[in-house]
């Protein structure tokens, strides 16, 4: 299945719009990961732990989006938008949502 942030796919023609699809992932941050990420933030540098969690959440959201598109009979999703939010008490959770339009392309 093709996934793209653009409204179409070069060289392909959209023959049917199947509907809007979305996928979400909400992940809690581990207290020890938070502690070490906080130390890294104090001394400078990137937090590899948070980067991995962001990537994991994005992958889950896109997999859900793809499965929902497949369930509608689509073979592509166009116009994908990915949003990131922090949730929960003291921003202890990360939510990634992905949405787009499921289509059939030829």
Curated annotation (Swiss-Prot):
The residues forming a coiled coil are none
Gene3D superfamilies on file: Hypothetical protein apc22750. Chain B
Give the UniProt family note: Belongs to the UPF0145 family.
The name on file for this protein is: UPF0145 protein Nmul_A0734
Source species taxonomy? Bacteria, Pseudomonadati, Pseudomonadota, Betaproteobacteria, Nitrosomonadales
